[in-house]
UniProtKB/Swiss-Prot annotation:
HAMAP family: HSP90. The lineage of its organism: Bacteria, Bacillati, Actinomycetota, Actinomycetes, Mycobacteriales. This is Chaperone protein HtpG. Belongs to the heat shock protein 90 family. Its main location: cytoplasm. Residues 568-648 are annotated as: C. Residues 354-567 are annotated as: B. It comes from the Bacteria. Keywords: ATP-binding, Chaperone, Cytoplasm, Nucleotide-binding, Stress response.
Length: 648
């Protein structure tokens, strides 16, 4: 065979990131072994599943295991598995992971990380834990052969900007990673990773629960053989293969028998995370459907939380046999950040995603898991408000997706949700908190949507609400534009957008019915003329009760699609036209009063054209005030420049 040997360079950003790894962005260098063993465990899981599905794959799965081998003389440490292995193309793709678009962002965040824990968390989030090997090694060699393939691949790098990759023969199935260790340096927390006791300690600490045996050849002293009655001879040193981990399923043990450290390490293994979880949820169901579940709510959101192609975090086992690693049928999409394990007792091992979609037991488990996670979040909200606030900051955006899809749990989702509001700049509010603060004459929960808090607060739609002291929820995330269209009320109180439909804010008697009727008569000609002048740009022109400072604003019908929502739909490839909107005028504003007088007195073509242009400018400023743009920006700019010129 002609070996294909290539020497390649890391991309510039990847090289800088690798340099950060080599120079130890965090002090707990022991974590490298956990990452290598976790990768090996994944490879064994994948082989067992592939052998089960592909009967033509001729592999021996009777003794799947992980080995660690230390060579004190050569100062090397090897972690080896007989799992699925990788092809040359897959190895190249693995290297490419380091150079994907998120690298620059990660590099910046690593430099800004305030402590070791923050750095560990970031490394785990971006899935580059393999490269933590360079914290303890001057050179890393990877040898791998894919199950069912004859050609193996060798990858090697010293982390200095280049790596080599070549095709080789004669390698065993699976993957081995050999680290050429750096010299010991206690000050830099570089220990002797060839020492049996150190490896035992790290494997027990980080990987005791791994489902596959982790083996190591250890030296043992045994007495020399001797006859009975004779003095024993000198002890001899023999090598014995020892299994270093207990392989006990953590979820099958009573919660009070599992330490917090054990839960934390198990979470880091299954989630490929480097930080501790925020909450542990242990469940056991007996009866019609028997299953055990161990779920974790992370402390931080993973970087691909909003990537629809990202894998889910729930592993499915049947009678402690691994079935699949990203079972999206066990948790709704809006809880995709939850990590964990579900071990069912009565399900067929011959299971596929298509079968799962129809499985009654899976649907029942999903319902129970969902309710348990939501009740746990509710407990956080009431018992640990600081943790809840962190949770909502990290995951609130995706949890609110459930308001659209999960009707059965909608009330609970509304209860656990938090929103910014005009009540406080610092503290978000729950809907229950909002209802408690409602004024006596208030019957609706008012909200406003927009791109930012600052933009919403400057919107003319809020003026009368602010003047009357009504609290308004400030909804600034894209999902908010969507869920408010399907959630009509909370606790019997209707939800009302300040920018949709008609609102009556004069019901307290400040503006009498007679006064409003008089205003209507006074402005009737202007309203009709504006509707005719603006034509297809507006559905209606009317007087407003929601404006106190601005001359005009645009209102969407109660059940209409807002421009912001239409932009969201268009971004997803859906062309949704925005219906015509209503122009509301402030009858007390000098511009509106002046326009009424100018329109009434326009008695020649020049004056009529001037007031028509003023009408266009008024409509354009209403669009700008809400964060939109005029339909014809060039025309608007021309009219504005002309009007400004006349004032000079």
């Amino acid at each position: 065979m002609n070996a294909r040997v290539e020497q390649l360079e890391f991309q510039a950003e990847a090289r800088q990131l690798l340099d950060l790894m080599i120079h130890s962005v965090y002090s707990n260098k022991d974590s490298f072994l956990r990452e290598l063993i976790s990768n090996a465990s994944d490879a064994l899981d994948k082989l067992r599943i592939e052998a089960f599905r592909n009967k033509d794959l001729e592999v021996d799965t009777s003794d799947l295991h992980i080995e660690t081998e230390a060579d004190k003389g050569a100062r090397t440490l090897t972690v080896r598995d007989n799992g699925i292995g990788m092809t040359r193309a897959e190895v190249v793709d693995l290297i490419g992971t380091l150079a994907k678009s998120g690298t620059a962002e990660l590099r910046a965040q690593l430099r800004e990380a305030k402590n070791d824990a923050a750095s560990e968390e970031l490394i785990g989030q971006f899935g580059i834990g393999f490269y933590s090997s360079f914290m303890v090694a001057d050179k890393v060699e990877l040898l791998t052969r894919k199950a069912g393939e004859s050609e193996a691949t060798k990858w090697e790098s010293s982390g200095e900007g280049t790596y080599t990759i070549e095709s080789v023969e004669g390698a065993p199935q699976g993957t081995s990673v050999t680290l050429h260790l750096k010299p010991e340096d206690a000050e830099d927390e570089l220990y002797d990773y060839t020492a049996d006791w150190k490896l035992r300690h790290l494997i027990k600490k980080y990987s005791d629960f791994i489902a596959w045996p982790i083996r190591m050849e250890v030296e043992k002293r045994v007495p020399a053989p001797h006859e009975e009655g004779e003095e024993p001879g000198e002890e001899t040193v023999v090598l014995e293969t020892e299994t270093l981990n207990s392989m006990k399923a953590l979820w099958a043990r009573p919660k009070d028998e599992v330490s917090a450290d054990e839960y934390n390490e198990f979470y880091k293994h299954i989630a490929h995370a480097w930080d501790d979880p925020m909450e542990v949820i242990a469940m056991k169901a007996e009866g019609t459907f028997e299953y055990q579940a161990l779920l974790f709510i992370p402390s931080h959101a993973q970087h691909d939380l909003f990537n629809r192609d990202a894998v889910f975090g729930i592993q499915l086992y049947v009678k402690r046999v691994f079935i699949m690693g990203d079972c999206d049928q066990l948790m709704p999409e809006y809880l995709r950040f939850v990590k964990g394990v579900v071990d069912a007792q009565d399900m067929s091992l011959n299971v596929s995603r298509e079968i799962l979609q129809q499985d009654r037991q899976i649907k029942a488990i999903r319902r129970r898991l969902t309710k348990k996670v939501l009740s746990t979040i509710k407990d956080l909200q009431s018992e640990r408000p600081e943790d809840y606030r962190t949770f909502w900051t990290q995951f609130g955006k995706v949890v609110k997706e459930g308001l659209l899809a999960d009707f059965d749990n909608r009330e609970t989702l509304l209860e656990i949700s938090s929103f910014a509001s005009t009540h406080s700049e610092e503290e978000p509010t729950t809907l229950a908190g909002y209802v408690e603060r409602m004024k006596e004459d208030q019957t609706q929960i008012f909200f406003a949507t927009g791109d930012s808090r600052q933009q919403i607060l400057k919107s003319p739609h809020l003026e009368a609400f602010r003047a009357k002291g009504y609290e308004v929820l400030l909804l600034t995330e894209p999902v908010d534009e969507v869920w408010v269209g399907v959630v009509n009320e909370f606790d019997g109180k209707p939800l009302q957008s300040v920018a949709k439909g008609e609102v009556d804010l004069d019901s307290d008697g400040e503006g009498s019915e007679a006064e409003r009727e008089e205003q209507q008569k006074e402005f009737a000609d202007l309203l009709g003329w504006l509707k005719e002048t603006l034509g297809e740009q507006v559905k209606e022109v009317r007087l407003s009760t929601r404006l106190t400072e601005s001359p005009a604003c645009l209102i969407t019908d109660t059940f209409g699609i807002t421009p912001a929502l239409a932009r969201i739909y268009r971004a997803t490839g859906q062309d949704v036209p925005v219906g015509k909107r209503t122009l509301e005028l402030n009858p007390t504003h000098p511009l509106v009063i002046g326009l009424r007088q100018a329109q009434a007195s326009a008695d020649d073509d020049a004056k009529k054209e001037a007031v028509s242009e003023t009408a266009e400018l008024l409509y354009g400023t209403a669009l700008l005030a809400e964060g939109g743009a005029p339909d014809d920006p060039a025309r608007f700019a021309e009219l504005l420049a002309d009007r400004l010129t006349r004032t000079l």
